[in-house]
Amino acid sequence: MPFVNKQFNYKDPVNGVDIAYIKIPNAGQMQPVKAFKIHNKIWVIPERDTFTNPEEGDLNPPPEAKQVPVSYYDSTYLSTDNEKDNYLKGVTKLFERIYSTDLGRMLLTSIVRGIPFWGGSTIDTELKVIDTNCINVIQPDGSYRSEELNLVIIGPSADIIQFECKSFGHDVLNLTRNGYGSTQYIRFSPDFTFGFEESLEVDTNPLLGAGKFATDPAVTLAHELIHAEHRLYGIAINPNRVFKVNTNAYYEMSGLEVSFEELRTFGGHDAKFIDSLQENEFRLYYYNKFKDVASTLNKAKSIIGTTASLQYMKNVFKEKYLLSEDTSGKFSVDKLKFDKLYKMLTEIYTEDNFVNFFKVINRKTYLNFDKAVFRINIVPDENYTIKDGFNLKGANLSTNFNGQNTEINSRNFTRLKNFTGLFEFYKLLCVRGIIPFKTKSLDEGYNKALNDLCIKVNNWDLFFSPSEDNFTNDLDKVEEITADTNIEAAEENISLDLIQQYYLTFDFDNEPENISIENLSSDIIGQLEPMPNIERFPNGKKYELDKYTMFHYLRAQEFEHGDSRIILTNSAEEALLKPNVAYTFFSSKYVKKINKAVEAFMFLNWAEELVYDFTDETNEVTTMDKIADITIIVPYIGPALNIGNMLSKGEFVEAIIFTGVVAMLEFIPEYALPVFGTFAIVSYIANKVLTVQTINNALSKRNEKWDEVYKYTVTNWLAKVNTQIDLIREKMKKALENQAEATKAIINYQYNQYTEEEKNNINFNIDDLSSKLNESINSAMININKFLDQCSVSYLMNSMIPYAVKRLKDFDASVRDVLLKYIYDNRGTLVLQVDRLKDEVNNTLSADIPFQLSKYVDNKKLLSTFTEYIKNIVNTSILSIVYKKDDLIDLSRYGAKINIGDRVYYDSIDKNQIKLINLESSTIEVILKNAIVYNSMYENFSTSFWIKIPKYFSKINLNNEYTIINCIENNSGWKVSLNYGEIIWTLQDNKQNIQRVVFKYSQMVNISDYINRWIFVTITNNRLTKSKIYINGRLIDQKPISNLGNIHASNKIMFKLDGCRDPRRYIMIKYFNLFDKELNEKEIKDLYDSQSNSGILKDFWGNYLQYDKPYYMLNLFDPNKYVDVNNIGIRGYMYLKGPRGSVVTTNIYLNSTLYEGTKFIIKKYASGNEDNIVRNNDRVYINVVVKNKEYRLATNASQAGVEKILSALEIPDVGNLSQVVVMKSKDDQGIRNKCKMNLQDNNGNDIGFIGFHLYDNIAKLVASNWYNRQVGKASRTFGCSWEFIPVDDGWGESSL
């Protein structure tokens, strides 16, 4: 059944019922206007609003000083009958579109039921309609009747795009927020919509270059209807409660105050800006106002001004407010019913939720300000339908929201030229200095007279920097706890499933009837709603700066389109000063190639190479090793946006590694929590039941405090950190598009330089080029979004949540003292309950409440990031041992106690690598808290660790199983043990039934993947199925364990070589984790990838690769050979020689010799690296050791051919020969420790990866660009893959 009563035409004759001339309150001597009653309590007036407020009767533009920041004026709009007919049909179509969704049906039903409360009488025992909630309807005979209504849709006033919801009057600011409510009118037009820019995401793949989008007008109308619903129910937030921004710094958005009412109406992230303390304040305030309504109904003895009965109206308001009624007819507010209604009105009815139901793209935040206005016509179904909106399935406009794309579906959108938007309001950012020559003329912000380089920055381009005034902080208040203290139920986060539950329980029947109202004065007069005082943004304020900003760097990437060639440069300053020069953060190699003019016959190859290089540049990432933190860094973000004045990719990466996410933030958020107020607990003399209840209430209130602080923390994070990250995301999209625009312009310019004959011989299409560049940007944005989401979550989890937890633990300690004293003081009453209650207090307050982001945020991207890198791993970890602050600690947030023996050793370079030797004092004991010893050992659990097991050297090691990790107590639990060539996992139940899963490896192989090499071990246990062991992320062995009984694990875990016969035996171990779930294969792989720390290069054994340390070399393509030197000097060469020798001990091991051949030493190219660790993309020199003397690996780049033969040269003789090597690390066929060395010439151009080439059966070492082109095209290992082998005690071979 449709929502609109019937199909109306503007020229339909009036009937005094649903088509009539009406007069509205406060209209003075207004002429009656034709109106259409589209549904009970809802009217539409297809006229410009010149009568609701006499001060707004002029449709002409006001003086500029009084214009609001976003405005559009056209006094002729809606002046003809055809326009009014189109308006009427457009509005009714939008109502039907809204009503066609479950959420829309609920909202419109709530509006129809939301009859303003009858509080118009001065006598508290009477109910009387408030006159300004009525209209006067002119009858066909010229008489009039008064009719109560809830909502009027009316055309806009002078500013056509000023859509808003207002009240007709009569002290409305009180009525809309005192629980009564008042009749609402919405200024709206279905003929206009707003443009916005968003990165479109489909299955997490951002689609860029898709143009600007237009808002679905059904979303806009739904937004205003939500305001109307808030105001009809009297729960609108006071307009004085606003979210303020700081405006002092150059980077801060100016003159913006967003009302809490707007944030709540939008929903999503924005609603979270209202902190939990203020939200609780609002909820309690309106709860009390609803109780006032119930009290008024209970007092009412009569009703006046209507033929309706008192009981009927009481039932109407009972239905509206979900009041409870006892047998005597007395009304009350049931807290659970109120909470359900309040959640529906304020959290379920939001713009953000409507977007999901409409299946449209929309601005991600209320702060995404309108950047364009479009004229539309939604009445024809070929343009817009009730079901699909603009995204019509039959017209191929449903994919990627193409129907809302104003460029793809351009016929439906006419952009208005005289729209005054926020871009008219700007700041002037000036860098001091002398401008020596002509500058760009992109805008008037370049002020040469002052010798300053100035740019205009649009207000909406700046950072949203929230003021501390937004965040209340009443957490320090002392709270009284009694036996009757109200305990709040845990809130559910809004989801589509929750909305569907509300829909299924929503009663759509019993719609209120039209009530006969006693005729009021023909001109109803009330009190006008005050107009908000809107001030223009401070315009053109000048800031003198000492450095270039993000906004300068973005401006430097732009260029003037003209007849001259565009030049790319790595200097932002040069680009700012020259009209035809654009700044790029791509490599100098790219700059050199793109700036080079080419002949016509080379054009296609040149253009294709540029596209290929563009993809390489944009997809560059550096990987990290921090679980639940940052796993990748996009290194060019720093130089692209001058983040932290990072002028190079290396500086940016190092800043993230060593200082963390704070390097990304323009302003460091202030986040402070007070010392939380403890509890004042009320005593009950000789009443055990009330005393115990009071203790339980105190513990429950303690849990509420944790939840409240977590929610408060998330609010601060979203407003102060995530908004910054989102702006960087937006600007990086713009930066990549700038690079693509410059690349296209240069290629197109070069093409246009050729003759027509030359062009005819070139198969070139600029659209194909654009498509390929956009594909590259799409791929790059996946990495950028992943990195930025991880940055945001990382700051929350590493900077804000730990601080909150520390404060909460202090609070717990104070609560413990209070409660234990309370128990002691009441011991005479509690008697036998004393010990139980003390244990309950101690156990509850010793356990932290884990933080779950999903309780407070419903953003899918952030939750996915949180889930993938935190929730699925870290939040299931009950033990995570790492080295930090000169000690081993448990990072799982459960704080296990760790006792370390005297003979436990740490690696000097990576202190997470722990050495345990075969001595009693070489022991690590981990004690889990009693409150954390979990029952999961009866269910599912997993463990993971890295281990390096030295070679077994003698027969004493044969058949000698010894334990290294033991969690068995009273003959039940689990352990990890080793034997010759075996890693063994043992589960033992309390009846001593045993199951073992084993990883076996052989020592009788030439080159082993496991002997003395770091191995990643994961063991998972599903009590209903199997126990499994994974090595380096691969499943090795599995055994059924469903037959095992109860397994009572100890709360102590011992790391020790127990039962080993070899006194010289030792092991290395790191990153031990215990999880209370069965990890799946993806989680194991993610854990392996993360902990592999692929941003740092490794040697053969898996240790960090180091500068100034000698290494033997192993080529992975031909591992049976080693590197040797023929002769020193440029005429000499280096080559692969073989085979390797063998090291044999009967029945123990048979291996190839590894310490053979010429040694390489990696030397620093620059002095910036201070920790001696070689990282991915480090630029280095390679020295080779011949007869104990170091020479430099180099080549003459001018050699003929692709392969450049490498030589070992006296270091002073290198001169201008090529010697700089870029170190590369990437997983290759599952080999984690392999490296590539990319040799470059003195201009930074690639000569090629170092490998070998056969010359007369001699495998000479060369640098070849052939490798660079092949790597990535095929998955096999090439001859440019190497491993660096240092001498290691665990291998046992004598070095040369």
Curated annotation (Swiss-Prot):
Protease activity of LC inhibited by arginine hydroxamate. Binds 1 zinc ion per subunit. Residues 492-545 are annotated as: Belt. Residues 449-870 are annotated as: Translocation domain (TD). One of its GO terms (molecular function) is protein transmembrane transporter activity. Zn(2+) binds at H223, H227, E262. Pfam families: Peptidase_M27 (PF01742), Toxin_R_bind_C (PF07951), Toxin_R_bind_N (PF07953), Toxin_trans (PF07952). One of its GO terms (cellular component) is extracellular region. Disulfide bonds join C430-C454, C1235-C1280. One of its GO terms (biological process) is proteolysis. There are seven antigenically distinct forms of botulinum neurotoxin: Types A, B, C, D, E, F, and G; new subtypes are quite frequent. Heterodimer; disulfide-linked heterodimer of a light chain (LC) and a heavy chain (HC). Interacts with host synaptic vesicle glycoprotein 2C (SV2C) which serves as a coreceptor. Also binds host receptor proteins SV2A and SV2B; glycosylation of host protein greatly improves the interaction. Part of a crude toxin extract that includes BoNTA2/NTNH, P47, OrfX2 and OrfX3; OrfX1 was not detected. A purified toxin complex has NTNH and dichain BoNTA2. Forms a highly interlocked heterodimer with NTNH at pH 6.0, called the minimally functional progenitor toxin complex (M-PTC). This is Botulinum neurotoxin type A2. It comes from Clostridium botulinum (strain Kyoto / Type A2). The lineage of its organism: Bacteria, Bacillati, Bacillota, Clostridia, Eubacteriales.
